[in-house]
Amino acid sequence: MLVLPVSVAIGPAHAASRTTRGLQALYDFRSSTGSIVVGQSRSGAAPGLKISDTKAVTRSEGSLAVRGKTLIRTQKPATTIIESIRRSGEITIEAWIQPAKIDQSGPARIITLSKNSSERNFTLGQNGDRFEVRFRTTKTSGNGIPSLSSGPKSLTTELTHVVYTRSRSGQARLYLNGEAAAEQTIKGDTSNWNRSHRLALANELSKDRPWQGTYHLVAIYNRDLSAAEVERNFHAGAGAETTLAQNRPTPGEHRFETEVAPLLAKHCLECHDSSTVKGGLDLSRRDTALAGSKHGKVILPGNAAESPLWESVDANDMPDDRPPLSAQEKKILQQWIDEGATWSLETIDPAIYTHDRQAGTNWVRRLTLEEYIATVESTVDVDIDQEAREILPPDLRADGFSNTAYNLIVDLKHVEAYARLAEIIVSRMDVIDFAAEYSQSRKLTDKSMRGLISKMGNWVLRGPVEDREVDSYRGISTTVASAGGNFKDAVGFILEAMLQSPRFLYRMENQRGDGGRWPVDEYELASRMSYIVWGAPPDRELLKAAEEGRLFDSAGVETQVERMLEDPRAIERSTQFLHDWLDLDRMDHLRPSPERFPNWDPNLASDMREETIAFFKEVVWEQKRPLSELLNAQVTYATPRLAAHYGLQLGGDGLARYDLSTVPSRGGLLTQGSVLTVGGDDASTVTRGLFVFHDLLRGVVKDPPPGIDTTPVPTRPGLSQRAIATERIANRSCGACHSKFEPLSFGLARFDGLGAYHAVDEHGNDLRDDGEILFPGAAKPVSYGSSGELMDLLAGSERVSKTLTWKVTQFALGRPLVSADARIVDSIHAKARAAGGTYASLISAIVTSDLVQTTRTETH
């Protein structure tokens, strides 16, 4: 096959950008001097390549021409690249090259990850007028034979874009200048890849397969790029500026974002942000911070000693009424100013740093109670709901959700409960019928049982069972047989053991690596996807997709997510998020004062919860509206009892749908009893304001200093809740913090502690529902004239929309988000918003993001 190098670009291209997902090493030969070829990857630096004989090469910006015999190799084994591809089982090798001549053979090594002429993990080489790729698997030779070659006369001395991809299922393809040139199935997996091999260009490690020509770009991915991605990289051109280079922060920017901004957020923004501006100084925004206070500039770049900010911090005058900065924190601040005070963020958002103390910890995820119940039912078709809720300890909330991994501990009560439940589950199963799905044999022989255990375990434990695990479960059947038991007994006891296995009760993942982010394997990804979308284990279709390697293709993942979102379990999972986010369990414990609310009907608490769930399903699933419209959608669901409580004209029986387009005071989550009751009997402006501040605006406020009297002030004739709040805001000791959140509740003032609407309170005080809202990060507040206008402002706010993205993402991951996640969450939000901002689009964006596709590895 003859492939002509048509429209090949050397210089930077503007029509397309290169794909970077899964990129493990990129060499673009930007440097024109030296003996080291510098590399980069998505996680930082890739291993450098040392040129053994610099006289044999000519370097210029964007290219490296090999004119004589040399070897360009890593000085150590390419461990990160090797381990990453061992895990993924996939690869893409990409090069922009110009061969110097046609008669190079051996094959002559263009790119190789190998030891010598007969031992390799892979090699891209030249054999005369063809390209040849050798890729080692458990089904090939140690030399990567059989190989894949392009057709005769496909290699020329023109600039050529050559790409080799190999999927986990074994499908290997060779592309030349964006077009498919050859394909072949290379069976086996990469578990036998040698960890000691080095990456090299222009020769074999044994220096006996030299190649001459010019390199413009070399890239290695741990996944197989799709044909569209290969074409995209081709059209980007040989000299395309990579997204990695464009987006990587400078050392100064990195220091500001990882050290200085968190320091300012922690110690300074309580008094010096857009809402307080104490002393006329706002340190939350770049323009205002560098402009200074009403007394002048406080930061003099390059001169900490004369910067008022540093002087006040160094003297422990600031922060006021709070502990001073530590010696290390002071050093960071001083050094930052002296080095030029680089300020790379337009706005410092304290919310993204709130949980950074947990940033370096990987928590193994135990199944929550809801997930355990769903997993049992999906795996063995047994409904264990009632018994599980009675026997298992409840999951406790932490950081706003009950599925927070670090709080999902296992104690002796859990161990005993899981053992009891496993026995109950197996007693309800038709064990023989269940085993028949995996083996028709009823023998207790080693061959029969090992095959059954392997196949059954793959389903029950959500992935392949290792030999040592098979040995362990096989020991159970051996013990049963020696005691006179039969096949049914053996399978029953094996199932009980599997149902108590950490692999069943936890979402176990391989986290060993180099400390960077590595891709999860196909079965780990399948479990992540299913528990995010369904709160349940992968079904057979998803496991099949994992087994066939279809989940390492973004289109394959999106296809599965789209299918999964059509399943009723996706709706159930979304309502679990809603239930957890709004803490709807509160309604089970709602006990209003009978003196204040003599007409309270305890059944209203359940009605309020059902209202919110039905409303959520209507907006999110029936109308498929953007999540932010949960704040102002003019519809609700109510029983006759709840409708009367709200003062609505009665509709149908049971839980009926109500159109609120003519009821301006109601519409959206904040006007529903399940949320309004967060303020307690007194309809507290503090707790309601904090709810809006924390859960809708992602605002941050510290606890009050020691010694501050926090006793609630009661209302009375002439003193409403708003008047009390206004006095607090004006108080020097309280106002700096309370001004951030209490005004957020003013628009809810006409709703009493149980959500009923009134124009006056119980003392006859007029209730106003107008006010102002200052969105975090904004320079100026926005006024509203009624609760309805407030709801519209919230629904239209980018801050609220992004907060919902953060909340759903946190629930999906089962952990608080940290500053290292912020850029990825921003991209998730942008992708979801471009697709309509719906729940479905958000879930799809989360699942296809690096937060789900990769894991943070540990070095021990």
Model-assigned labels for residue ranges:
Residues 247-290, 303-308, 312-331, 643, ...:
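Sequence context surrounding c-type heme c attachment/ligation sites in exported
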Residues 158-173:
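Localized edge beta-strand/strand-to-loop motifs within extracellular or lumenal beta-rich domains
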